[in-house]
Amino acid sequence: MSAVTVNDDGLVLRLYIQPKASRDSIVGLHGDEVKVAITAPPVDGQANSHLVKFLGKQFRVAKSQVVIEKGELGRHKQIKIINPQQIPPEVAALIN
């Protein structure tokens, strides 16, 4: 499975998360996943909620349209973005 998969209702992203980074950013490809750096620490779900908020801004969707499908407690996650309004260039480059 590739890092980015296009479905009828949106995108599925396989992510590798780097918490406690100096800034929020989509870093690029990391193995077969997209690496995302976020500033929030991995404590009490702070990193997950920060990730959902960050991806919502990047794809211009509501937070409710960013769904963590797998990996709630780990660095490796599968995220679904429902009907993205925009696709960041770092992700667009990975779509086959």
Curated annotation (Swiss-Prot):
It comes from the Bacteria. PANTHER family: UPF0235 PROTEIN C15ORF40 (PTHR13420:SF7). SUPFAM superfamilies: YggU-like. Transmembrane segments: none annotated. InterPro entries: DUF167, YggU-like_sf. Belongs to the UPF0235 family. The lineage of its organism: Bacteria, Pseudomonadati, Pseudomonadota, Gammaproteobacteria, Enterobacterales. It holds the Pfam family DUF167. This is UPF0235 protein YggU. GO terms for cellular component: cytoplasm. Gene3D superfamilies: YggU-like.
